[in-house]
């Protein structure tokens, strides 16, 4: 089976596991972008421990879920966003100010929209979570 967007697949696996009330989600297949996105989610308290298992087929992550995710999803297409436009995208994808995060891939790595605004850099929108 060919995966066209590994990050989107990972986010949907997390969302489905949260909906049915599971305590953990198995993310497979994985890549570095998925890992860095999971680290941002972990930093903001949306997921718990992230464990990598090398199964000889590309590996997989076991993510501990904390039950704090109401909605999570990829942003497709991946829009380029300038520093000054982040607030507009925040209003479009998040339910209210100060609730949830946008995940942005920047030249300085994958980070939340909050960090991107602090550093005054833009990037490409990857996902939203609240």
Swiss-Prot record:
GO BP, sorted A to Z: translation
UniProt protein name: Small ribosomal subunit protein uS8
NCBIfam families the record matches: PRK04034.1
Transcription found in the keyword field: no
A Gene Ontology cellular-component term: cytosolic small ribosomal subunit
InterPro entries recorded: Ribosomal_uS8 (IPR000630), Ribosomal_uS8_CS (IPR047863), Ribosomal_uS8_sf (IPR035987)
Highest taxon of source: Archaea
MF (Gene Ontology): rRNA binding; structural constituent of ribosome
Family: Belongs to the universal ribosomal protein uS8 family.
């Amino acid at each position: 089976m060919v995966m066209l967007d590994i990050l989107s697949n990972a986010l949907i696996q997390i969302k489905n596991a949260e909906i049915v009330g599971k305590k953990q989600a198995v993310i497979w297949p994985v890549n570095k972008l998925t890992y860095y996105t999971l680290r941002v989610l972990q930093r903001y308290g949306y997921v718990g421990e992230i464990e990598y298992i090398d199964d000889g087929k590309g590996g997989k992550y076991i993510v501990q879920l904390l039950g704090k995710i109401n909605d999570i999803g990829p942003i497709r297409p991946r829009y380029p966003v300038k520093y000054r436009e982040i607030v507009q995208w925040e209003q479009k994808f998040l339910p209210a100010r100060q609730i949830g995060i946008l995940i942005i891939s920047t030249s300085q790595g994958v980070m939340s929209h909050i960090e991107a605004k602090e550093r005054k850099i833009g990037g490409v929108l990857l996902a939203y979570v609240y």
